[in-house]
Amino acid sequence: MLKFFKTWTLPISMLAGAIGYFVFANVTFLEPTKPFMYTLIAYLTPFLIFAQLLLTFCKISVRELMPSPWHGWLLLIQAISSLVLAALLLWLPMREEYRDVFEGAMVCLICPTATAAAVITGKLGGSASSLTTYTLLSNLLAAIVVPLVFPLVEPHAEITFFAAFLKILGKVFPLLLFPFFLALFLRRFMPPIHRFLAGLRDMAFYLWAVALAIVTGQTVKSLVNSEAEIYVEILIALGGLITCIAQFYWGKRIGTKYNDRISAGQALGQKNTVLAIWMSYTYLNPLSSVGPGSYVLWQNLFNSYQLWKKRKNELE
């Protein structure tokens, strides 16, 4: 049963999230619980993201973190590509539905590397330590860029840019960076707790599954309550596909020049989509969360193909 769940976690979690939303939206006797559930989810999602990052960073040593030239190039691609889309959203007049397409793509570009990317990288024959280093660096980049850009892209009349900047900074910066420093603190001053957390091999995986179900439910809610035409939702999903293809392509191309093609491809292409959906749903137009929501499918389809191809080559 456990093996079945691990194999089919992605569709099971997404299906559970979608069904969960429709149950709470349509079952009348659950109506009184809605305010509590909305509040719970608002706190639970960032907590699950924090816990995943903490468990991931507890498994690594600072001595394993090795900066590489390709790290700089990939960070530059992430920053420039997301800032270009932000500039288009700021200065190019466009209809609201097309803004959602660009917002969804922008989140897919600035979003940091997935915590599970090191596992896939190792299975594909890449350098897990180099990938983990980039995961930390991409978290730092997102923690800086997101609070600066999101309030400009999606301003609110009732709050100033500086107030919005501080609000997002206060939530995103600790969420992405504190897990690393907490892991270092536990390793140095509380070794028993650190060893316990590092020994929870599959816990981050299960936390990811729960978080994916929650953000899928939020994405479905955005789709159901949106007045946008179906073609707009398709365009947002296509934006996720284009950014997925582009990032895997450029990651692998740059990685080839430094003899680390697999690691660089996964570093730029495999995203922390739970975080991306949460950020777009919380700080941008909620409909834009369809972009990173579709990215979940695109990156997992590509990773499945890569793993299948590697197994096929090993058998030949």
Named regions from a protein language model:
Residues M1-E316:
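Alpha-helical transmembrane segments of multi-pass small-molecule/ion transporters
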